[in-house]
């Protein structure tokens, strides 16, 4: 697919956000969110674009590294997949360094959480981990506000 008038391949960056402190607390959550991110990457690739998938960015340090990686790969656009709650400090360094437009993906793993199964779990830690797998919308207002304040389109 030709992405611009120069005939070069259109390249999109993809990264997902999470919070590194969650992984040791909630068994399987990191792997689950990584799997969802892979699904998004495959869907993007089906459109014919080149996808630079940096996976889960879950700390400010990884955010800085991701921003540099997107610049190095000369991405034309970034898809930010909000997989669960995360801090704006895991987002802002990426988009500031990349200096390209960003599309927020607020996608849920399914149409709704299965509350019947959820309420039968009986273990509050497992329940919280399950809830976090459906917590995409939690961070979107914070991210949108940070983008607005920093004038990021």
Residue positions per predicted region:
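An N-terminal assembly and electron-transfer interface module characteristic of large anaerobic redox
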Residues: 1-153
């Amino acid at each position: 697919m030709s992405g611009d008038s120069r005939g070069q391949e259109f390249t999109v960056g993809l990264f997902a956000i999470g919070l590194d402190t969650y992984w040791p607390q909630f068994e399987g959550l990191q792997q689950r969110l990584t799997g969802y991110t892979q699904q998004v990457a495959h869907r993007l690739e089906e459109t014919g674009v080149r996808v630079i998938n940096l996976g889960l960015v879950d700390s400010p340090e990884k955010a800085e590294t991701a921003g540099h990686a997107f610049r190095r790969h000369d991405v034309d656009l970034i898809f930010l997949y909000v997989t669960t709650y995360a801090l704006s400090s895991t987002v802002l360094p990426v988009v500031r360094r990349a200096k390209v437009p960003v599309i927020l993906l607020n996608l849920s793993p399914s149409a709704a959480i299965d509350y019947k199964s959820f309420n039968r779990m009986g273990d509050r830690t497992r329940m919280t981990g399950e809830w976090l797998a459906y917590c995409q919308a939690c961070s979107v207002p914070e991210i949108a506000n940070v983008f607005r304040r920093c004038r990021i389109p």
